[in-house]
């Protein structure tokens, strides 16, 4: 267990009651580099520091930037503890939509140009991947899910099954099964995970299922 815990306020609030007596350091959004530098400063003091990352630290998480910022301190030991990313936890809620080949695409253009995101959506839907969308919407990107659906609808049927899981693992968790066409006008936020099936995905007893190819 760590002596010091580093992360945004929202994630610290989720764990602080489980680690009483520990020191917690928090930063705001878009302060990832500063957060890593603070963690290194504490580690250089001889403390064991735990960087808290939602889901899996190696999937849209803090593991990569932590290694980059700590590159000049090879004497520090970094251990990445695997977690459960939203694609896996969300898929479990929806059924079994990611049984076949799938890809993860973030709709956030904060670090990736939208033009590159558009190309990835187009190529992935052309290749008939099941697609899991991270960061589908925010206050400034309220129409990005609509844009993404319009791109995918060029390559997929409008009735391809899709699902939304909101607030995964929290008390207010909820989900809904829909279609790619209907998904376009659904309300989502940064705590939503969206999964679009491929051409073989079906709804079985209210759950999304993508066949692997077994003969029944």
Please tell me what each predicted stretch does.
Residues 1-5:
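Short, small-residue-biased leader/transition segments that mark boundaries at the very start
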Residues 59-127:
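Class I SAM-dependent methyltransferase SAM-binding "motif I" and its flanking Rossmann-like core
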């Amino acid at each position: 267990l760590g002596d010091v815990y580093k992360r945004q306020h929202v994630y610290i609030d989720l764990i602080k009651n489980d680690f009483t007596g520990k020191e917690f350091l928090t930063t705001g959004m878009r302060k990832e580099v500063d957060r890593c530098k603070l963690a290194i400063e504490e580690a250089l003091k001889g403390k064991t520091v735990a960087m808290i990352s939602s889901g899996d630290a190696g999937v849209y998480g803090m593991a990569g930037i932590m290694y980059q910022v700590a590159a000049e301190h090879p004497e520090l030991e970094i251990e990445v503890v695997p977690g459960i990313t939203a694609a896996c936890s969300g898929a479990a809620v929806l059924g079994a939509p990611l049984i076949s080949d799938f890809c993860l695409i973030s709709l956030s253009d904060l670090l990736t140009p939208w033009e590159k995101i558009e190309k990835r959506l187009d190529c992935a839907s052309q290749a008939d991947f099941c697609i899991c969308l991270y960061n589908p919407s925010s206050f400034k990107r309220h129409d990005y899910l609509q844009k993404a659906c319009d791109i995918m609808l060029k390559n997929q049927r409008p009735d391809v099954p899709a699902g939304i899981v909101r607030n995964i693992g929290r008390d207010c968790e909820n989900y809904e099964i829909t279609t790619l066409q209907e998904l376009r006008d659904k309300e989502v936020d940064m705590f939503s995970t969206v999964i679009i099936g491929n051409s073989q995905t079906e709804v079985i007893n209210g759950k999304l299922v993508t066949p692997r190819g077994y003969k029944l």
